[in-house]
Amino acid sequence: GGTSVLDTFRSYVYHSDVSGSAEAGLEVQARDSKKSEYVNDPVYSGSAGGFGGALLNGSVKDSKVTNLRKVNGMNYTGGFIGHLGKSGTVDLDNLGALGDLLSAGAGVMDVFGSHVDRCSVEGVNEGFTVHSNNTIDQKNKSEIAGGFTGYADLGRLSENKVTGLKQVTSGQIAGGFAGKTTFAYLANINLDSELVKGLVTVVNQILKALWLDELQKGQVIKIDLGIIEIDALYDGKLVSLNLLGLDIKVGLAEDKSLATIYIGDSKIEINCSESGTIDEESLKNEINISLIKANRTKIDKCTVTGIADGYDVYGGGAGNNANGTGQYGIAGGFVGWNNEGLLENNNMFFADVIRGAKDLTGPFTGKSSLNSNWEFNDVKGIEGNE
């Protein structure tokens, strides 16, 4: 039917291994570089990684690289994957009747990042190095290097590990685990949009069923939004569903007075009326804020561990005896440039020298950007659980 256009065509790689030889180890090198422009958001090829060069809107889980010695790239370079990129999933111009519902959610549907969970990189005994240096084009370049990934563009990374890291170097941005993170606020969503109305309808229908104790564990609920019908699953505590690519979970407290709603990474708690429903205006406001915050790089429960002598991170062309230079000479022990990414419960061990340009170097992040007018945002909120 018409809802088939909502299917996300992703590349999936599960339970896969890449292993270098016991003696020489694995070496990977990118030899070319090109720039592509996407509405003032350039993307560069020349990516390199021990497992993959670039992953656009894909998922890799439970996979590993062992005996890695060296990864050299022109631009985005990482020990595991150089470029964790985003891509569009739906052409809104060809949706017909669904266009009205999706138009306000264009930011939700157009932008999906890649997911990497429970993956690992392990170096040879003497450690592995990651190096980003564009030798082809010194003007059109984006040199970003990280021990696990170079450029995590809206990527979601959870429970990944780097061990045996020796050095990360870059002509521009360098980080022990990731080079750069990004965000994409969905600020154009209107409170009266069909997307928000749809979410309000979904949440209230689920809460009413929970309030009336009508649901059994494992039961599938069908919610009709007119244009599309959505299936939701009850696991005994929460009702889970996916609306237009948004993961949503809804629960009700035992005394039925408080509803808890999860939209992506955001958690909403709001009081219920005696009939089990929530005031629509209050819910609209809460949902709108959650949607605005929905799209950002998230790195959670990840670890980078250096060799016994410690790992070095050099940004901006820095070296053993020189500091980095330039406005992008950024170096951080865990992330080079955290551009409003969400970093939670991460660890770094055996970091030695972190060196970049003046005021762009730090033990955890080299630079943290937070240019936001939203009162719910602060640096502690996005890097608070280090």
Language-model features: locations:
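Surface-exposed loop/turn motifs in large extracellular/passenger domains
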Residues: G1-E386
